[in-house]
């Protein structure tokens, strides 16, 4: 069953998020340093009548990497073509995409860390020299055909920057890491989104949803949609703190943004009494695969100090015991 606090996209998220997505930097809340720098780089590129350097966005899922790519497209008055690395299986797939670009276009590749080494090799000359090298034939009779490409900007997005090869990473002239959002920022996003959904969201209600959203806009917007359902059923045009609490409690999302899976994870670690538990053991105990543990469950818990990763495995912090309202011996956390 899908988790309401899942950071990966649901099938319905794309259309829903797009309808609520800001089209320019004026409407984009959060990531202030990134916005400031991008505004400078975009203004400079437009002044020189040039394409932007290639851009890499990294950070946990759901923080707005795709939104930023679309805003850059708008600000540069450029067309954007979007794909995801898993869809580029052969060098011919990438060649077809690149040869269909026009001058000044933006190519957005999501999950770029999942490109195969063979695909990366095709991408290198395209990024550096705007040239496509295609090998025809094999063995001694093989020939390389060089095709000139229009100048374009590649925007890559990744949740696992460490999996990018150094040669690929080094070809991005601009690299930005998106950070988790503050509750106050999420509350502003929620109030603006509610208006687009023909609702008014009280400030306290927005903050209540925000603090249960794991510092992630995608989750906040998904929770807002469900809270709106509760308001609609009760014929309410205004989302109140009381209604938000009722809805979120009914959805099984507690005041810290934890659902049943998070609680099972933390209960497993706290029961170990500071004895590290390996990733494989955690995955087996939770009946989840290791990638889901690393990419979905752990990022928020790590970023907020609920767990620690050591060479021997994962351990719960004192904050986890407090979150679960468990007593613990202070000596457990003494060096």
Curated annotation (Swiss-Prot):
User: Hydrolase among the record's keywords?
Assistant: yes
**Documented EC number(s):** 3.6.4.-
Main EC class the enzyme belongs to: hydrolase
Q: What Pfam family is a match, any one?
A: RuvB_C
| Domain-level remarks | Has 3 domains, the large (RuvB-L) and small ATPase (RuvB-S) domains and the C-terminal head (RuvB-H) domain. The head domain binds DNA, while the ATPase domains jointly bind ATP, ADP or are empty depending on the state of the subunit in the translocation cycle. During a single DNA translocation step the structure of each domain remains the same, but their relative positions change.
Q: Which PANTHER family match?
A: HOLLIDAY JUNCTION BRANCH MIGRATION COMPLEX SUBUNIT RUVB (PTHR42848:SF1), PTHR42848
Q: How is the subunit organization of this protein annotated in UniProt? A: Homohexamer. Forms an RuvA(8)-RuvB(12)-Holliday junction (HJ) complex. HJ DNA is sandwiched between 2 RuvA tetramers; dsDNA enters through RuvA and exits via RuvB. An RuvB hexamer assembles on each DNA strand where it exits the tetramer. Each RuvB hexamer is contacted by two RuvA subunits (via domain III) on 2 adjacent RuvB subunits; this complex drives branch migration. In the full resolvosome a probable DNA-RuvA(4)-RuvB(12)-RuvC(2) complex forms which resolves the HJ.
Name of the protein:
Holliday junction branch migration complex subunit RuvB
Q: Name the gene.
A: ruvB
